[in-house]
């Protein structure tokens, strides 16, 4: 089992209970979409699965280990097997795209190789190849500040694919893309997961994209799992209850370029 959660709760430093009573199992190679209204706890759940946040209570197992029972060094080694795609990728404005993508391997490289890569990219062909899959090969040597929000999101996805993780977590990975590009990008992510037996868990605002691309749908509301169903079992009643007093249509995408930088996990 890639992910196992039992009785998980997570309370933020201000006392807010963000996740409560979560019981969840996700097997290796599964493709799972997490949907729910804004503020439901989707991003918090993904950060928990990435071992960026510790649970306040309950049992957590990620890739066969409890991250918070490991030493710092072993936990970092575990994190090198996990990729987290942020809605607003934490890419320094003046960083070149080739460096941003190759950073996906930093957790697997030693210090010397990582420093050398900053001075002179070590795998130009490999980074170009993964960017080409996302129609960004021509942006290889451009700076991140020259890219649009949707292009930055695709660079973040390219970095995750280049990392070649066992567990790929994606937080609203296509929110800044137009519908056609979002559909194409999710299809690419899912195909990669199938071909490489990668466990893929993505949070999405666009319900129609979640239902179209993911076999399993988890509905989250108020920090709790509202339903956990096969995509073909999710009906209008499930969605109406999940999004009670909410709009099903996605909100305008944020300007990724103006989002404050956050540290990479």
UniProtKB/Swiss-Prot annotation:
Residues 245-265 are annotated as: Disordered. This is Phosphonates import ATP-binding protein PhnC 1. ATP binds at residues 36-43. It comes from Pseudomonas savastanoi pv. phaseolicola (strain 1448A / Race 6) (Pseudomonas syringae pv. phaseolicola (strain 1448A / Race 6)). SMART domains: AAA. It is found in: Cell inner membrane. Its EC number is 7.3.2.2. It holds the Pfam family ABC_tran. Its main location: membrane. Keywords: ATP-binding, Cell inner membrane, Cell membrane, Membrane, Nucleotide-binding, Phosphonate transport, Translocase, Transport. It comes from the Bacteria. It is a peripheral membrane protein.
């Amino acid at each position: 089992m890639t992910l196992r959660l039992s009785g998980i709760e997570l309370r933020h430093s201000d006392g807010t209970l963000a996740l409560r009573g979560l019981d969840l199992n996700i097997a290796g190679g599964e493709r799972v979409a997490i949907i729910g209204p804004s503020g439901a706890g989707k991003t918090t759940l993904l950060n928990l699965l990435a071992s960026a946040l510790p649970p306040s209570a309950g049992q957590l197992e990620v890739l066969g280990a409890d991250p918070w029972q490991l030493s710092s060094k072993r936990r970092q080694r575990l994190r090198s097997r996990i990729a987290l795609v942020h809605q607003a990728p934490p890419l320094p404005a003046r960083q070149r795209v080739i460096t941003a993508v190759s950073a996906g391997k930093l957790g697997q490289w030693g210090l010397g190789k990582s420093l050398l890569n900053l001075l002179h990219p070590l795998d130009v062909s490999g980074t170009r190849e993964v960017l080409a899959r996302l129609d960004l090969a021509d942006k290889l040597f451009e700076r991140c500040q020259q890219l649009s929000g949707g292009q930055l999101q695709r660079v973040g996805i390219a970095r995750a694919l280049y990392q070649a993780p066992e567990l790929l977590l994606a937080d609203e990975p296509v929110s800044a893309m137009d519908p056609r590009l979002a559909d194409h990008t999710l299809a690419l992510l899912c195909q990669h997961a199938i071909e490489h037996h990668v466990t893929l868990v993505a949070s999405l605002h666009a319900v129609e994209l979640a239902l179209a691309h993911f076999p399993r749908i988890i509905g989250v509301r108020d920090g709790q799992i509202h339903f956990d169903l096969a995509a073909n079992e999710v009906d209008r009643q499930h969605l109406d209850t999940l999004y009670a007093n909410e709009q099903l249509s996605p909100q305008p995408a944020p300007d990724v370029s103006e989002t404050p930088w956050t540290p990479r996990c």
